[in-house]
Amino acid sequence: KENDKRRPFVITRACYAGTQKYSTVWTGDNQSLWAHLRMAVPQLCNLGMSGIAFAGTDVGGFGADCTPELMCRWVQVGAFSPLFRNHSSVGSTYQEPWQFDEKTLRIYRKFVELRYQLLPYLYDLFHECELTGLPVMRPLVLHYENDPETWNLNGEFLVGENLLVAPVLEQGETKKIVYLPEGTWYDYETKKPYQGKQYYMVDAPLDTCPMFVKEGGMIPTYELAQYVGEKPYDTLKMRIYPGDGTYLHYQDNGEDFAYRDGAYNEYMFTHKGNEKEASVQMNKEGYTKYKNILFE
């Protein structure tokens, strides 16, 4: 911070209460095992509930050799984790995406690209975390504490309050039993509705991670980029799902501390029923606005 005024990026695996003020955290030297993939979800949710929201696991596992199937499923968890990082030890099979077969590479690319498209949603959640302490990756019990079905639910999680992710965590499975809490939920891609307070068996072939959006939910996305900074983020696309809802979107330059001096924008989106668009109100204008805001 003293040298170039840009926000620092620090990563550690040894931490204590309060570390979240200084560093992101990863969960240590895991192994390329399905059991360790299953552990990743409660580990990251527990860290978030303990105040350490910016955390992740070694995608694919650090020790031993990762299989193509395990890598595909781990990437589907990592893409929604606050810290998304593939990492492995010397002596294990190389885990770069291109070291795998073409099918695995295609699936890996799909979820990395989805991550890039979801950056404005994730950024909003980090902003919310800074203001309130709410984690980015959340156990369902955080928002549905009166629903006993969520008390010991470790196979799915929320990203913010609007997006529910239910990854496959068992070897060889191509279907997923998903619990949806109260309300109506919509498939992220197809917008097919599901009534809550019940379990569903949904298809989940190797290239699919079940995702659901809460009724009235809105998910901001950017146009696909291959890396941050490849193109200007001047167009915001807002995915709208049926139901009444509001959404606060935050925008700044993503690089320095100018936001502390007011160099940021806040947009309040309001949506009702089955409308295809939402109204937009500028709550705060201190930065370059988007050229386009699109709805889908």
Model-derived regions, located:
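Catalytic-domain carbohydrate-binding cleft regions of carbohydrate-active enzymes
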Residues: K1-D207, K214
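Accessory, solvent-exposed terminal regions and/or long lumenal/extracellular loops of proteins
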Residues: T208-E296
